Amino acid sequence: MITNTALEYKGNLFPSKVVSYEHEGDSISFNTDNNVILKVTILRDSLIRFRFTTKGYFSNDFSYAIDKSQLHGYNFLNVSEEENHFEIRTSKVKCKIKKADLRLSIYDLNDFLILEDELGFHWEESYEYGGNIVKMSKSSKDGECFYGLGDKATQMNLKGKRVENFATDQYAYHKDQEPLYKVVPFYIGLHNKQSYGIFFDNTFRTFFDFCQERRNVTSFWSEGGEMNYYFVYGPQMQDVVTTYTDLTGKPELPPLWVLGYHQCKWSYYPESKVKEITSKFRELKIPCDAIYLDIDYMDGFRCFTWNKDYFPDPKKMVAELAEDGFKTIVIIDPGIKIDKNYWVYQEGLEKDYFCKRADGPYMKGKVWPGECNFPDYTNPVVREWWAGLFKELISDIGVKGVWNDMNEPAVMEVPNKTFPMDVRHFYDGNPCSHRKAHNIYGTQMARATYHGVKRFVYPKRPFVITRSAYSGAQRYTSSWTGDNVATWEHLWIANIQVQRMSISGMGFTGSDIGGFAEQPTGELYARWIQLGVFHPFCRTHSSGDHGNQEPWAFDEEVINITRKFVSLRYQLLPYLYTMFWQYIEEGIPMLKPLVYYDQDDTQTHYRNDEFIFGNHILVCPILEPNAVGRRMYIPRGEWYNYWTNEFAIGGREVWVDSKFDEIPVFVKAGSIIPKYPVQQYVGELEFDELVLDYYFKIGKEKSEVYEDAQDGYDYKKGRFSFLSFRTIGKEKELIIQLHKEGKYETPYGKYKINFIGLPFKVTEVEIDNEKIEFSAVDFELNHFLIVEKGFNELHIVGE
């Protein structure tokens, strides 16, 4: 017999019958007779928010994840009451809510069932902390697949997996390890060629189960807070990802140099070592734009200080590096050393800016400097103070970017590796414990850092990178996948992680090339470089405890492969820049898993390795040693082997030969790929032509090229160049139409168009309806034309 009252009532609780409802504007509220309220808000015809409370009223509606600058609106909304349910209809979907228990189901307008509750919303009282453990379970359809969730070191398709979201410092993590550094509680479901998304905007520790515990049930739950989630309808995965990215926000355009190659190590010091590294890059003609300084540049690991023994004149050093094309990036951690003679600590203490325990004393934890206090970045006053601390680094010394690390937050020598859960946070006027603030701590640090860097680097654009992040962090920062390991398994993990981050809204992501922990072989490093140059963020980083990891740390062959692939990245910078422009303008991910590219082809649903880089390039890394090629899946359509220009029909798995200095790369037929000449750093060269590689296709295709001044904010005033190419290929004819938008005039005056795969001999060329003189013999030999920029239509006729 149970006599303990708490135990007697412990267990799952459920909404009871609906007793009333109200419809006001874009929101409909349903009230049950046991005080549960479900508030349904229609943000768009395909974006619906579901918010539950069990106490008869809602707490303050606040989210760090949602981009409040986005305007929402729907085209159609109708609410009707039926005998057993309510129906909410938009121009895209209809939602039925049962009167008996608030369980809901969502259909398209053809009555196809997209998603339905199993148990639906339920909860359990949290007797240890107060509040509720909130839960949701959904029925899963046969063959349903699941994607997203950000930084997860597991298969692309999450079917059969259970994952945990709690930002954690996981040094040398392994495949399937949970949790990791980032928290992105957003997933994409796909069944019967229909995609939808769920974003569970809850910053407490959350869990997702994709049919692991029960075969046909998907569930998600949190240790506290509200059951507050957004449903996003596709039906294409592209629509789901774009809508979610709009909801949580997009970054501003980075300066072009940020898309170059970066070199980092824990740590490069003293100054002579830094210059030795940068000089070697220039000597070997391996392009590089950024050099990083890890924690050893500081005085006793105190943030915003310099070790003058290692770096006696940092301003002079940074200026000299800049003359050679290197931008200096420095690390800044959240732990502020407890030292009464340290000016940052003095200010934080004087102004009461550090996090406190529940009963009053400051949160104290050991990090690199020893005992530290930690700023409460959830307080806007503290964020403003933190932003101001960057003045000397950026304005005076000339540092170009900041790297935030250890901001999960990580604390050494404690069992849970982070703050105690009783630490209090301001949470922008919604005071709470660390249970609620933990997952957004790193994002708010990155936010404060971003505003500081942006303020002092102006009129140039800022660059910030963070290890820990929550949904929406992409508005302020790039990221990397944390302390990985120099193993072939981690090369496989890195490939999937960056793809997954890309479709989870955080596209500006890369991995530590070569692995942070342990030491790669030359072969592994070369294969990682070959993958890493196709990631949005491209940086080699390693632990100094495990040997050297510069390209020349191996042999001449690895040096040559590194030069070849980094040079290729620099050639593709206009293509990369265009990818980024489409990401910030339209929410289109820069990397596209094959399932995103073609969800109707079931062969793509379980592919991990292959991905689309931008819109037109297919990449498949080599992920095992001693490989002379690999099997890979070429998606449906027509493609050209980048290295051989051989034509390939997709929709099938094929063997592709691949030498050590190559990986399988294919270009979509009909595409135009823009290229710059190889530069050792962005801005090194002036050039008078843009190379355009055109890959012939019978039919139509679109390609785009975005350019601007490569830094600064004139692009926001219309001073950009956006070229839209439309190609029409026929058996003996090719038409290239060009439309330009924007007021920016590129410094080059010509296009060099390389024609690949032309099936006919060219006999006539017209530009804007005027025939031009050209040498058929030379064209036959070289297959290119040099034309003045600014044409509207290029017409090529053959026989």
Predicted regions and their residues:
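Catalytic core of carbohydrate-active enzymes
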Residues: Y450-P462, A469-W480, I493-Q497, M501-S511, ...
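N-terminal accessory segment at the very beginning of proteins
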Residues: M1-W257, C264-W266, E271-S279, A290, ...
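Short, well-ordered loop/turn elements at secondary-structure boundaries
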Residues: N34-N35, E81-N84, R89-S91, A100, ...
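Active-site-proximal structural scaffolding
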Residues: D33, P179-L180, F220-S222, M237, ...
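Aromatic- and carboxylate-enriched substrate-binding clefts and catalytic-loop regions
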Residues: K55, S63-A65, E116, P287-T562, ...
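Conserved, mostly hydrophobic/aromatic
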Residues: V40, K92, F186, F281, ...
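Internal mixed beta-strand/loop scaffold within catalytic domains of large alpha/beta enzymes
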Residues: Y107, F112-D117, E164-D176, Y181-K182, ...
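Surface-exposed interaction regions enriched in Ser/Thr/Asp/Glu
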Residues: E788-E799
